[in-house]
C-alpha cells in the first residue's frame, strides 16, 4: 500500500509540475485561445474557410495571438511590421522551422530544404540553391521561359484545360533547367508522375494532424505497427527513386543543367545524392503547384475585372504593339502589368500562414515567446490589412504603382523567403504579359446563361489554398495576334541544348 501511495504522489506531483510549467508558459504568451484539450487551438482551425477563423482570432485578440500548435506554444502574427521585426531584425533566432517529424524525418529522410531547422545543413543546401536561383542567375533563364510561355500560348489556343496548360509550363521549365529535357505535352507520363509525387507530398507533409508531430517519440514506433509511418516511408522511397533516376539521366545529357552545375561547384564535394534529390526536387515540389494555382487566379481576376485588363492591354499596345509578343526585357516599361501580377498575389493569398520556429526565449512587446515556439506568419491577414491597404477586398493593381520595388508577402520574409521567388515572379510575369497581350477573358455561357465565378471558392490543403475549378472563355484578341502566336511558334528553335549551354556559360562567367 505504501508503494502504491508513493507512486500516486509522484505521479500527481509530476502532473502538477507539468501543468504548472505549461500554464506559466502560456500565461506569458500574447492573448489568445487557451488550450483546454491538448490540441484544441490547432483543431479549431480545421474547418472550411480557415482564413476566416484566422481573421477572427486577430479581431478578438489583436495582431499577436498566443495559441497552441500541435501541443506546442505558438504565436500567430497578423501585421507585416511585426513579421519584419521578428524575421528580419531578429532573424538570427526566428529563422528555424517548427519540427515536423512526418514531413522532415520520415517523408524526406531529413534532407528537405523547406523543413530543415536553421543550422549548418540548411545553410549548406540553401547556399547551393542560391547559386542557380539568385536574381542574376534567373535573368539568364529568360530565353527558356519565353520558349515555354510561347508553347503555353499555343496550347491555350486549342485547350480550355487551363490548369493542365499552366502545369506543363512550369513543370517543363523546371525540368529543363534541372535535368536538361523538356516536357512537351500536358499528357506526358513524366508530368503525371511528377504531379502525383508533388501533390501527395505537399498534402501529407503540410497536414496538421499527424500525431507524431505532436508526440515525436512516436517516430520510434516500428513501421509494422504504424500505418502512417509506412505511408511516409513509401512517399520517401518513391521520391528518391524518381529524382535519382532523373539525376542519372541529367548527368549524361549533352547540355548544361542544375545537376551538372551542382556537381561542378567546388564547395559541394560533400553533398550526397540524397541531399541533391531534395535540393532540386524541393524546387519542383514547392514551385509548380503554386505557379499553376496563381495563374488560375490570374485568369479569374481577368474575367472578373475587365477594367484592369483594359488598362494592362492599353499599356502593352503602347509599349509592344501588335506585331510581336512581349518579352521579359519589356517588363521595365510595363509597370501596370507588373502591378497586375502583384495584385493577383495579394488579392487572394494562396498560403494562409508560413511556419517558423524561434531558437531561444525572446521578449517582444511585453510578452515572452519561449524557445521552440511555433511562429505563424498570417499572410492572409497581412494582405487584407485595412490599415495598410485601402479597400483590400477590391482588385486594384494601381495600389502597387507608387513603389515598384515593393513585393507582396507571398514569398515570405527574412532568411526563409522562398528560394525560387525570382524565378517564380519572372514565370508569372512572362505568362501574364503574353496572355494579356494575346487574349480576351470573358465568362463562359451555358444554356443562354452566364456561368458565374466564385472568387472565394478554394480547396483547403492544410495552410494552402487551391482555387476550385471554374469555367471561362479565352479567345485571341484579333486574327492578327493569332497569326503572330502561330508564326512565332513555328519559327521558334525547339532544341534547348544550345539555350542551356548558353545559360551555363553565362552563369559560370558571372560567378567566376
UniProtKB/Swiss-Prot annotation:
Pfam families in UniProt: p450
Reported consequences of knocking out the gene: Impairs the production of trihydroxy confertifolin and deacetyl astellolides A and B.
Enzyme class: oxidoreductase
Induction (UniProt): Expression is regulated by the secondary metabolite regulator cclA.
Cofactor: heme
InterPro entries: Cyt_P450, Cyt_P450_CS, Cyt_P450_E_grp-I, Cyt_P450_sf, Cytochrome_P450_fung
UniProt keywords, alphabetically: Heme, Iron, Metal-binding, Monooxygenase, Oxidoreductase, Signal
EC numbers: 1.-.-.-
Residues annotated as binding heme: 418
Family classification: Belongs to the cytochrome P450 family.
Function field: Cytochrome P450 monooxygenase; part of the gene cluster that mediates the biosynthesis of astellolides, drimane-type sesquiterpene esters that show antimicrobial, anti-inflammatory, and anti-tumor activities. The first step in astellolide biosynthesis is performed by the sesquiterpene cyclase astC that catalyzes the formation of drimanyl pyrophosphate from farnesyl pyrophosphate. Drimanyl pyrophosphate is then dephosphorylated by the sesquiterpene phosphatase astI to produce drimanyl monophosphate which is further dephosphorylated to drim-8-ene-11-ol by atsK.
PANTHER family: P450, PUTATIVE (EUROFUNG)-RELATED, P450, PUTATIVE (EUROFUNG)-RELATED-RELATED
Protein name listed in UniProt: Cytochrome P450 monooxygenase astB
Amino acid at each position: 500500500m505504501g508503494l502504491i501511495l508513493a507512486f500516486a504522489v509522484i505521479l500527481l506531483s509530476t502532473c502538477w509540475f507539468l501543468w504548472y510549467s505549461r500554464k506559466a508558459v502560456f500565461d506569458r504568451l500574447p492573448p489568445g485561445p487557451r488550450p483546454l484539450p491538448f490540441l484544441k487551438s490547432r483543431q479549431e482551425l480545421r474547418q472550411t474557410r480557415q482564413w476566416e477563423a484566422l481573421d477572427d482570432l486577430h479581431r478578438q485578440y489583436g495582431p499577436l495571438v498566443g495559441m497552441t500548435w500541435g501541443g506546442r506554444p505558438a504565436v500567430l502574427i497578423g501585421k507585416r511590421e511585426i513579421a519584419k521585426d521578428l524575421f528580419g531584425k531578429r532573424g538570427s533566432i526566428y529563422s528555424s522551422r517548427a519540427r515536423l517529424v512526418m514531413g522532415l524525418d520520415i517523408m524526406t529522410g531529413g534532407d528537405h530544404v523547406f523543413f530543415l531547422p536553421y543550422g549548418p545543413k540548411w545553410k549548406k543546401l540553401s547556399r547551393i540553391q542560391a547559386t542557380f536561383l539568385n536574381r542574376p542567375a534567373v535573368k539568364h533563364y529568360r530565353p527558356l521561359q519565353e520558349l515555354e510561355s510561347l508553347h503555353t500560348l499555343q496550347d491555350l489556343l486549342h485547350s480550355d484545360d487551363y490548369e493542365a496548360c499552366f502545369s506543363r509550363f512550369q513543370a517543363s521549365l523546371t525540368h529543363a533547367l534541372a535535368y536538361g529535357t523538356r516536357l512537351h505535352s500536358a499528357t506526358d507520363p513524366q508530368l503525371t508522375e511528377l504531379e502525383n509525387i508533388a501533390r501527395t507530398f505537399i498534402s501529407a507533409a503540410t497536414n496538421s494532424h499527424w500525431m507524431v508531430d505532436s508526440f515525436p517519440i512516436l517516430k520510434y514506433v516500428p513501421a509494422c505497427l504504424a500505418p502512417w509511418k509506412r505511408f511516409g516511408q513509401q512517399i520517401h522511397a518513391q521520391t528518391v527513386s524518381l529524382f535519382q533516376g532523373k539525376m542519372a539521366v541529367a548527368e549524361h545529357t549533352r547540355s548544361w543543367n542544375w545537376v551538372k552545375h551542382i556537381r561542378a561547384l567546388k564547395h559541394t564535394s560533400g553533398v550526397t545524392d540524397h541531399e541533391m534529390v531534395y535540393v532540386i526536387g524541393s524546387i519542383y515540389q514547392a514551385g509548380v503547384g503554386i505557379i499553376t494555382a496563381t495563374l488560375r487566379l490570374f485568369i479569374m481576376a481577368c474575367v472578373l475585372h475587365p477594367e484592369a485588363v483594359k488598362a494592362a492591354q492599353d499599356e502593352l499596345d503602347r509599349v509592344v504593339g501588335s506585331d510581336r509578343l512581349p518579352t521579359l526585357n519589356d517588363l521595365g516599361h510595363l509597370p501596370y502589368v507588373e502591378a497586375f501580377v502583384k495584385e493577383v498575389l495579394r488579392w487572394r493569398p494562396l498560403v494562409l500562414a508560413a511556419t517558423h520556429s524561434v531558437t531561444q526565449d525572446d521578449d517582444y512587446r511585453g510578452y515572452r515567446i519561449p524557445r521552440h515556439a511555433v511562429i505563424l506568419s498570417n499572410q492572409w491577414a497581412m494582405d487584407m490589412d485595412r490599415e495598410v491597404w485601402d479597400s483590400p477586398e477590391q482588385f486594384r493593381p494601381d495600389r502597387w504603382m507608387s513603389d515598384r520595388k515593393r513585393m507582396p508577402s507571398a514569398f515570405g520574409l527574412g532568411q526563409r523567403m522562398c528560394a525560387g521567388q525570382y524565378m517564380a515572379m519572372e514565370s508569372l510575369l512572362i505568362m501574364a504579359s503574353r496572355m494579356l497581350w494575346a487574349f480576351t477573358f470573358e465568362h463562359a455561357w451555358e444554356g443562354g446563361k452566364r456561368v458565374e465565378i466564385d472568387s472565394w471558392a478554394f480547396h483547403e490543403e492544410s495552410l494552402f489554398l487551391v482555387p476550385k475549378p471554374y469555367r471561362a472563355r479565352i479567345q485571341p484578341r484579333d486574327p492578327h495576334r493569332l497569326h503572330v502566336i502561330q508564326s512565332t511558334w513555328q519559327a521558334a528553335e525547339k532544341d534547348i541544348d544550345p539555350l542551356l549551354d548558353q545559360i551555363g556559360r553565362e552563369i559560370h562567367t558571372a560567378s567566376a
